């Protein structure tokens, strides 16, 4: 439950979210390797598992269950954020926490809820990245920076669910292109290595963010610790 630690550090201790998130990212990777090696009773951080329960065949297509989970999460996130009292309070605590506090909303509670929900969704995202595609995973390898690419998707999507979805699809196309580049004749003829193709999503994200980041408006109080006494 690394999201619990991040929530406590950033909300109760007023720690910088970027520094706290980076520290927890390093901690989670190291902890996963320790657990994997403990399970294996060896120096290997690789775990083997069956992923068939998450993958289903629909005619010529192979679809994993996380596709449907993602679509449900997208719809629910929109409904919760824009159609419910909880969503209104969450957004208020991200935009104007002092104003929210003045009408009786518990800003600390709302921010805890937001961070914990984000932690759950992030965990599901990690499972979606690992489980359906392979039947074993080496925790020493990690996810090759996909988490940081997700941050770029959020910024490009301007913190709005459906825009984030479109941004995710856009970057997924580049990711898929990198995976199948060797089977496309004119790309294979370029003689690029697989590592060069794997760089494409990250290069694309930097180029796009360079042109769009100024127009992307984050919640006004994003990353700013809330001090009740500063009203």
What role is predicted for each listed range?
Residues 29-45, 122, 126-134, 168-187, ...:
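Juxtamembrane/transmembrane-helix interface segments of polytopic membrane transporters
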Residues 12-24, 108:
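Alpha-helical transmembrane segments and their helix-start/interface "positive-inside/aromatic belt" motifs
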Residues 77, 95-102, 106-109, 182-231:
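Cytosolic-side transmembrane-helix boundaries in multi-pass membrane proteins
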Residues 29-33, 67-79, 118-126, 150-156, ...:
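Hydrophobic core segments of alpha-helical transmembrane domains in multi-pass membrane transport
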Residues 60-138, 161-162, 166:
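Helix-loop-helix "hairpin" substructures at the membrane interface of multi-pass membrane proteins
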Residues 132, 137-202:
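Transmembrane alpha-helical segments in multi-pass inner-membrane proteins
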Residues 17, 28-83, 186-196, 223-231:
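Transmembrane helix-bundle core of multi-pass membrane transporters
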């Amino acid at each position: 439950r690394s999201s619990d630690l991040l929530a406590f550090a950033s909300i109760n201790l007023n720690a910088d979210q970027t520094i706290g998130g980076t520290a927890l990212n390093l901690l989670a990777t190291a902890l996963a390797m320790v657990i994997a090696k403990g399970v294996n009773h060896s120096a290997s951080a690789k775990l083997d598992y069956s992923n068939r329960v998450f993958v289903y065949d629909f005619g010529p297509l192979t679809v994993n269950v996380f596709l449907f989970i993602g679509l449900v999460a997208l719809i629910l996130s929109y409904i919760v954020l824009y159609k419910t009292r909880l969503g209104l309070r969450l957004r208020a605590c991200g935009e104007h926490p002092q104003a929210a506090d003045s009408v009786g909303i518990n800003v600390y509670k709302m921010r805890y809820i937001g961070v914990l929900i984000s932690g759950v969704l992030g965990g599901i995202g990690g499972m979606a990245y690992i489980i359906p595609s392979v039947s074993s995973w080496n925790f020493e390898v990690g996810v090759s920076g996909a988490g940081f690419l997700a941050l770029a998707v959020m910024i490009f999507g301007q913190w709005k669910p459906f825009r984030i979805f479109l941004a995710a699809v856009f970057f997924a196309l580049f990711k898929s292109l990198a995976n199948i580049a060797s089977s496309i004749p004119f790309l294979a003829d370029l003689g690029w290595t697989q590592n060069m193709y794997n760089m494409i999503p990250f290069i694309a994200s930097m180029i796009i963010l360079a042109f769009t980041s100024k127009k992307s408006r984050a919640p006004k109080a994003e990353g700013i610790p809330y001090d009740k006494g500063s009203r």
